[in-house]
Amino acid sequence: HILEHTVLCGSERFPVRDPFFSMLKRSLSTFMNAFTASDWTMYPFATQNRKDYYNLMDVYLDAAFFPDIDELSFKQEGHRLDVTGEGKAVRLVYKGVVYNEMKGAMSSPDQVMVRSLLNALYPDTTYRHNSGGEPAVIPSLTHEQLKAFHARHYHPSNAFFYTYGNLSLKDHLAFIEARVLSRFSRIDPGTDVPAQPRWTVPKAVVYHYPLDRSEDPEKKYQACVAWLLADIKDTFEVLVTAVIEQVLIGNAASPLRKALMDSQLGTA
């Protein structure tokens, strides 16, 4: 998540502060963003103008594969110590765009539940980690670790390039070859994610999350029952599971959902 932000803070061919936000103001784009998940980071954009399309592709490719990743950007986007308060009340606090963002996200009980569930279901794979960043752990990341992670993972051998529209695919490939691929050699990044080993018996886990002082702890417990099912590439099993989910809990009249609500075991 920190790397997703930091690569957009200047690159080899665009050594300006925040070229991403500069393009937001100047471009004819209909969409520009960046997303991070447990096993991928995506830099999507869209525009209806051919010239703008290649301008945006130029900025995005250079940002992803040849970013500056300077220390000031790391401190801005990741974490740093700031002085706050005055006089005897002065103190040091952690700040940073991603750090503050994730502090806000992880203050939500629902987010804590989702992250805890993934941690419990996938204890032996990358999916156990909070890809956004755990606020308590973010300050342990170093600038050198961030650069090393980029060198290993942000490589064409570990990337997919997706294009859509009525522009020439041949032109797209020639552009990507000239800007990026011609400067790299193929490697094995070793980023395959193994399947989570299956358990022989069910497991129960307990996680904690903070409450406001005014909240009643007796009314703030959350419960979740989950199963590790088919491989995501097994499209038939995934479809069947989605249908079953809709039948059982898809709306207020669904039998399982209605039974749980009528039981008054808790509140939704």
What are these regions (language model features)?
Residues 6-201, 206, 213-240, 246-268:
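Charge-rich, well-structured scaffold segments of protease-associated domains
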